[in-house]
Amino acid sequence: MGEVITIGLDIAKSVLQVHGVDENGAVVIRKRVSRAKMLEFFGSLKPCLVGIEACPAAHHWGRELEALGHSVRLMPPSYVKAYLKRSKNDANDAAAICEAVTRPTMRFVAIKSKDQQAALMLHRARQLLVRQRTMLSNAIRGHLAELGIVSAKGRQGTGTLLGIIADAGDRRVPPVARGVLDVLARQYHALGSELGSIDRNLLAWHRSSEASRRLEEIPGIGPVVATALIAEIGDGWKAFRSGRNLAAWIGLVPRQQSTGGKEKLGSITKQGNRYLRWLLVAGAMAVIRYAQKHGTLKRPWLGRLMARRPTKVAAVALANKIARMAWAIIVHGERYREPGVLAAA
């Protein structure tokens, strides 16, 4: 029996499937390992290459196996699927992972540290609470609309409705309706308080990260966007050959439908990290709204773009540019400089 050189590891909650091969590709190990005996099993092996799909708990196992001396590579599940043969089961999945991790063109995911994952938990919890607050706001608006009470859009309008609910002297709201609406209003206020706490924690994390502070200097990037970029990409910035590769990974480049030497570009791919894409486009929209009010003297490129393209198309193009600038600042260790400063230099 040959020495194990490469292992494909299909992870799950309780039982993990191992598929190991030697230098000739011959199968040496094909077995299931319980979670409790996982580290003991890999501790008994000589250091080897271990492939894992980038799914829940993958970063945890990646850190644990690297601590044992193994070389761990995480891969997007969609890229591994091409190597799956016949029926899908744990054994076949592990074999596909083992095959995929050895491919020279395979793209890998950087293993995140616990600190990065903690920051991402703040972002995901924030997303959840924002959605819940929006649901409560819509419910309050819908219920009061049935009573003929409406208000303006946005949080200011919701605040007006909350004031009506709190006013016991407003006879437009029946007592029974006021009782149930008061429950929703208290939940709305509680969510606002929790969101404030999460935002303070994000700001503290942002201030503790020198890279995150440098990213904040880019117009369109604030503490939320900066911390999301640093936490999501981590040490993987140099895995992108250029800023365009980063923008493509986020999904901010046109979709190609080219054949026969003829290039045809469509709308953006919307592949990759949806959350980062949403944040960058939102930041770009803020820059455009500011430019619409105060002019584009410092950014003539943006002025020309806004003149010939719809606002949302311009926002996506600007988001692409922001992503490229972020890559250059992190990879080259630079700081953001305004276009006017660059021209004078």
What do these predicted ranges mean?
Residues M1-A345:
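A detector of single, family-specific signature residues
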